[in-house]
A protein has these predicted regions:
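Non-catalytic cap/lid and distal C-terminal segments of serine-dependent acyl enzymes
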Residues: 1-276
Length: 276
């Protein structure tokens, strides 16, 4: 038993107005050990999408969380950091986590219009969330100390923000990216970008895909996920990153779930925080 893991981490909760919906969004902030005692210390910040799934399994969509609090407590040698969970928009999640409208999904045969608010969500993060966090807490606001982590569609929007706002975000954790949903659009977009001094951790399992995905794609879902991550790795190298700035983790039998992603969160945090 690791007695060093038994300590309290303070969490704060805030409501911030989302400009494109006019509604408030819950933002939760997990502060590092000793934050209140050392008033002269400043910290890197890790922003995590799908905030409902980040901290507690009881409120997670899947019934499993990312186990962020145990990950921090059980790895005390990692650099201290602030973790910010940004809730998704529930029924509007697919819209705000997709920079482009979906054009060729089976589900669209029912007359639905999905996607296309990713740019607005990115603006919300850059112009509302991050300035609020930087002004409220003792952060290191520079890009090299600012990370974003997401999974599935939450990974898609992380990939987009990492390119669109590369001057703001210097570290990414991309788990089980579903950018096969907008593959042609993403490929064109990333081909226009040059990237430098960014650390990116990429995780994908060999047993990806869930019941929701089956409504969104035809074909081999497992291969779609693997190809999306392998392509992204190569695209980042073409965009200017070195292999030392990238880590690709293909997990044998890894599934599309928080239970799987949580296992590799400490590895991700170690990699992106290497220079902190």
């Amino acid at each position: 038993m690791n007695r060093d893991a038994y300590f309290y981490l303070e969490m704060k909760e805030h409501e911030l107005k989302v400009p494109y919906t006019g509604k408030n969004r819950r933002i939760r902030v997990l502060l590092p050990k000793g934050y209140a005692q050392d008033e002269h210390k400043y910290y890197p910040v890790v922003y995590m999408n799908d905030g409902q799934n980040v901290f507690y399994s009881g409120e997670s969509f899947s019934g499993h969380s990312w186990k962020v609090i145990p990950a921090i407590k059980r790895n005390p040698d990692m650099p201290k950091m602030i973790i910010v969970g940004i809730d998704n928009d529930n029924e509007g999640r697919m819209n705000e986590y997709a920079p482009w409208k979906f054009s060729s999904l089976p589900i669209l045969n029912f007359g639905l219009t999905l996607g296309g608010l990713g740019s607005e969500y990115a603006d919300f993060f850059v112009n509302v969330v991050k300035p609020f966090i930087d002004s409220t807490y003792r952060t290191k606001p520079q890009r090299e100390y600012t990370a974003m982590i997401g999974s599935s569609l939450g990974a898609n929007i992380s990939q987009y923000i990492g390119l669109e706002h590369k001057d703001v975000v210097g570290c990414l954790g991309v788990f089980s990216s579903a950018n096969w949903l907008n593959k042609p659009e993403f490929d064109r977009y990333i081909s226009k970008h040059k990237v430098s001094d960014q650390r990116v951790y990429i995780e994908v399992g060999t047993n990806e895909g869930d019941d929701t995905d089956k409504q969104l794609a035809n074909g081999n879902l497992k291969q779609l996920y693997i190809d999306a991550s392998l392509d992204y790795y190569r695209q980042l190298i073409d965009a200017g990153l070195s292999t030392s700035e990238l880590k690709l983790n293909v997990v044998a039998n890894g599934e599309h779930s928080e239970e799987c992603w949580a296992k590799y969160l400490p590895e991700c945090l170690r990699f992106i925080s290497e220079n902190w």
